[in-house]
């Protein structure tokens, strides 16, 4: 789902993840929670699902891109890191099920020329879950916190 206010100083908030794999869908759940918030002009929400090259166009039309994604990095589930990745090598070593697709997408994004500012909120998960739409209690608790951090990042731009 895409919601847009204007094209002036456009900020794209892009949630990545598979909501059929529990905690792995954290990025999409954060975007869904932000849909209930009155967003400032120029802020757009996009459910990026498991990522694909179809996301290049909305990413390139933004002045700033804020990504929210899950990572299996050994940190406590629900830990949040704010990163400024430039290339796929700047991402956490172990992203989850869509690892290669998202990293390839970021590399292609920068190779195509227009490079808006990118911020990644990497949310640690414990493990991949098979076929469940429910997130763990730890991840459910962190959704409002991550949504707040993302909104703060968008407002600061």
Give residue ranges: language-model regions.
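A generic local secondary-structure boundary/capping motif
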Residues: 2-3, 56, 108-110
């Amino acid at each position: 789902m895409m919601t847009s206010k204007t094209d002036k100083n456009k900020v794209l908030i892009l949630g990545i993840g598979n909501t059929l794999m529990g905690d792995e869908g954290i990025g999409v759940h954060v975007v869904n929670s932000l849909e209930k918030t009155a967003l400032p002009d120029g802020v757009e929400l996009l459910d990026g699902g498991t990522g694909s090259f179809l996301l290049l166009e909305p990413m390139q039309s933004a002045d700033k891109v804020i990504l929210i994604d899950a990572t299996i990095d050994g940190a406590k589930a629900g830990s949040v890191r704010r990163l400024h990745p430039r290339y796929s090598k700047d991402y956490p070593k172990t992203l989850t099920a869509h690892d290669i697709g998202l990293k390839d997408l970021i590399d292609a994004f920068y190779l195509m020329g227009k490079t808006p500012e990118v911020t990644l909120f990497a949310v640690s998960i414990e493990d991949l879950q098979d076929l469940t739409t429910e997130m763990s209690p730890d991840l459910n608790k962190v959704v409002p916190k991550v949504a707040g951090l993302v909104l703060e990042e968008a407002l600061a731009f």
